[in-house]
Amino acid sequence: MSSRSYKRVLLKLSGEALMGDDAFGINRSTIVRMTDEIAEVAAMGVELAIVIGGGNIFRGVAPGAQGMDRATADYMGMMATIMNALALQDALKHKGLDTRVQSALNIDQVVEPYIRPKTLRYLEEGKVVIFAAGTGNPFFTTDTAAALRGAEIGAEIVLKATKVDGIYSADPNKDPTATRYARISFDEAIVRRLEVMDATAFALCRDQKLPIKVFSINKSGALKRVVGGEDEGTLVHV
């Protein structure tokens, strides 16, 4: 078993990360690669909970949602996360991982509701828990759901998987002199106006002294290196 720096973590996966190079939907090779990395971390003995977004599915129907009531659109997005959670659960099952999906919206015939004591028991038993439907409320992002669930389950860190390998002093695609921060405090990130998460999620993590690690999900082995405490991505700390 490889060494680990954390016992319990909350992994935030965006729905867009599941698209791979596709315009929307779930790219099969991408989800297989992700589950390989998740399986590696589970094999290290890390208790792993996952919050997943729904942008890859909602993007496909977004043009039809123009002018729609915001709350209605948000509920559609929540249901998209349930579809992603089921797809991820199925892929993890094929890796031999015992996985549970818990939803903030009640769809009892498909997934079980989020019940914190059950979540904690599942994690202690070595099961991977996937949280779906965000917070269950409109106007809150899945980043906020990640911060909330991370605090609720006593995660030691929120791992935010993105398309870039950390937080930079400027947009690295536009500024060749941009440098990656290895570590930065919550207060520094605010002063420098660096976008780590949405404001609500960021404030919740800061208030609960819950550190955030931003790293690239597209970088092979990055998740394992992050959990192992290596210099990967950017750590946002109190």
Swiss-Prot record:
Pathway: Pyrimidine metabolism; CTP biosynthesis via de novo pathway; UDP from UMP (UMPK route): step 1/1
One protein family per Pfam: AA_kinase
Listed SUPFAM superfamilies: Carbamate kinase-like
Catalytic reaction equation(s): UMP + ATP = UDP + ADP
Record's subcellular location: Cytoplasm
Entry GO CC: cytosol
InterPro entries (alphabetical): AceGlu_kinase-like_sf (IPR036393), Asp/Glu/Uridylate_kinase (IPR001048), Uridylate_kinase (IPR011817), Uridylate_kinase_bac (IPR015963)
Keyword vocabulary terms for this entry: ATP-binding, Cytoplasm, Kinase, Nucleotide-binding, Pyrimidine biosynthesis, Transferase
GO molecular function: ATP binding; UMP kinase activity
Activity modulation comment: Inhibited by UTP.
Main location: cytoplasm
Role, per record: Catalyzes the reversible phosphorylation of UMP to UDP.
NCBIfam families: pyrH_bact
UniProt record similarity statement: Belongs to the UMP kinase family.
HAMAP family, sorted: PyrH_B
Protein name: Uridylate kinase
Gene: pyrH
